[in-house]
Amino acid sequence: MKKILAILMVLCLSVGILAGCGSSANAPASSGENSSASSDAASGTKKTFVFGDNTFNASNEEPTINPHEAYSGWPCIRYGVGETLMKIADDGTLEPWLAESATNVNETTWEIVIKDSVCFSNGRKCDAAAVKACLEHLIEVHERAADNLKIASIEADGQKLTIVTSQPNPVLMNYLSEAYGCIIDMDEGITDDGIVVGTGPFVATELVTDDHLNLVKNTNYWDGEVHIDEVTIRNITDGDTLALALQSGEIDAAYGMAYGSYPMFENDSFKFSGIQTSRCFWGMVNFSTENPSAAIMLDPAVRKAIALGINKQGFVDVLLNGYGYTATGAFPETFAFGQGVKAESYDPEQAKAVLQEAGWVDTDGDGIREKDGVKLVIRWLTYPTRLELPLLAESAQATLREIGMDVQINNTKDHNTIRKDPTAWDIWVSANVNAGLGDPANFFATYCLDNSVKNSGGHHSDRLEQLADQLDVTFDVNERARLAIEMQQELLDDNSYVFVSFLRMSMISKANVTGLEAHACDFYELTADLDIK
């Protein structure tokens, strides 16, 4: 009996003027920079929108909008250029998007029907053959996607796509909803500067990495009227500069605003759209024997003391101004697979006792413990494009100093290069959406396993590998949750990963901006609903 794992699309098309596939091409880019939208809206001319974002840059592995490169699928989907077959609802469930339905025929075969109305922004129909070409290129060039999807073959027949996987893959449709799953027109190709043609409400016309992206309205959009004519995405990595740009009217909305800047926008001139997310601030321990600090990081007492010595609640209350909540494991407790895990709580006195018992003693009175002539120094690697991460580093530096550790912070945009050098760091601390796909598998597959592309610390656990193998082929949702809880506990019992807090994500805009809504998966930002009133 066939298992329907995605909801059949039964709703009618949205009411509105829909441009059909094959209609006239989109307008070319206008010359010069876009001005703020509010002035254009007031004058009755074309509507423009300027969006400030501190994550759209090469150091964040988002140099372009090509979803087949690194993590560039994020700006592709966020800025309304690309769309995926299914969409992640705020409760973590799947909803149809480009696909009308997805049916799990058997453990390794899926049938996906593409909506007949979908077309690319160049007017070309998005049929199953176009999706096939896109996915085949994706798994050819994108290592992480190929490992996640486990696609053995793809067949196209009209609007029906048949995917056969090399092994049972219960969450294939979740993975195809990841940002790298944006469907792009491979006949159109990918430009040298990373511009692609998608199915979304906006069309990219100019991209300068680490600076800006220009977009225009997709006049062929298949899913409703697009209200904004032109969009400029500005990469603004400095928190103060981002705040001043919004306050002065240089931009119309901002993503990634520092929490310390929120009070200046808590008035009638601005509005917030916020939601609890699974974006987690967390640290990974370096287990490499090549690490000159191996004697420190391979000591279970040191790892336990670090977990005991980080004040999670203080970080949330003081440095995040309450815009977050403490973490125990990798996932929020709102998910079934985030419940019931146990981790060390902040207890500096117990941390001191653990270190003392393990032979880490301050013999020279400088406040830093040592053992066998080795000072207890922790090299903390993080990055500035998530404005909260440097604050977490400073908080941990202060509280770990109290228990006798010298935390040396390397806060650099080059962290993704440095983390690949096992001699250069002891703890790598980042911020990631751990349950953005509504399922736990992606976090473990990306960060925790022997073949994970971002297991930079070289963590290994026989038990974790066994559990991951079971998770990969388990279709029952409750059993998947049980396995994920056990996998988290394996990480926490060894203190090889420390999960500090989850983020309440907000976008801030001028009060006259509508249709800019925050979502729990953190994928969807600019949509056809975006408007200036």
Residues covered by each model-derived region:
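N-terminal lobe/hinge region of extracytoplasmic solute-binding protein
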Residues: G52-V105, V197, C521-D522
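Aromatic- and charge-enriched surface segment that lines or borders ligand/interaction sites
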Residues: E100-H142, I296
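Surface-exposed binding/hinge segments that line
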Residues: T103-E107, A146-M186
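Extracellular/periplasmic solute-recognition and catalytic clefts
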Residues: A145, S153-E155, T205-N214, T232-N291
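Append "and occasionally in soluble cytosolic enzymes with long acidic Gly/Pro-rich linkers
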Residues: M297-Q397, E486
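Detector for C-terminal structural segments
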Residues: G309-Q339, E388-Q397, R419-K533
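Ligand/substrate-recognition segments at binding pockets and active sites
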Residues: V361-N434, M505
